[in-house]
Amino acid sequence: MFKGILLCVLFAVLSANPLSQPEGFADEERDVRGLASLLGKALKAGLKIGTHFLGGAPQQREANDERRFADGQQDYTGWMDFGRRDGQQDYTGWMDFGRRDDEDDVNERDVRGFGSFLGKALKAALKIGANALGGAPQQREANDERRFADGQQDYTGWMDFGRRNGEDD
């Protein structure tokens, strides 16, 4: 579920830049419909990937539970049986407290790797957004310093609303 949420956030960040561009009304309506279908497809793909990483589709997990119950491996009396400490798992979902095995360690490594991938993707998306808004902060500061040195701007603060083109009122 964590990975699915991260994928949804990634798609939202990546789609935020095109949504902020001004366009005509008819084009906007057509684009919104196209973007909605694209976002729907992306979310479905993200959910498929998320369920794959989290142990398969719900029907597959239910079939696995039924097989465990039929084989006598699982005492399926309830999903909140905290007292059991044998090797079998009662419930493989989010209420599985305190149990760790090799599979959990592998999943944590996958999450860390996926998290670093999302971190890099987020940095790239922020860089694209900064470039669309006028460059990186350091670049904007350098541009402001150049304008101040050339006498084009009296740089007294970033909220100087009263002046137009460097003239005093």
Swiss-Prot record:
GO function term, MF aspect, one: neuropeptide hormone activity
Keywords: Amidation, Amphibian defense peptide, Cleavage on pair of basic residues, Repeat, Secreted, Signal, Sulfation
Highest taxon listed in the record's lineage: Eukaryota
Pfam family membership, one: Gastrin
Propeptide residues, chain positions: 27-72, 86-87, 101-151, 165-169
InterPro entries, per database record: CCK-like, Gastrin/CCK, Gastrin/cholecystokinin_CS
GO cellular component, one term: axon
Modified residues (Phenylalanine amide): F82, F97, F161
Tissue/organ expression: Expressed by the skin glands.
GO biological process: antimicrobial peptide biosynthetic process; digestion; innate immune response
Modified residues (Sulfotyrosine): Y76, Y91, Y155
Stated role: The pharmacological activities of caerulein are quite similar to the physiological activities of gastrin and related peptides.
Family classification: Belongs to the gastrin/cholecystokinin family.
PANTHER family linked to this entry: CHOLECYSTOKININ
Name of the protein in question: Preprocaerulein type-3
Organism: Xenopus laevis (African clawed frog)
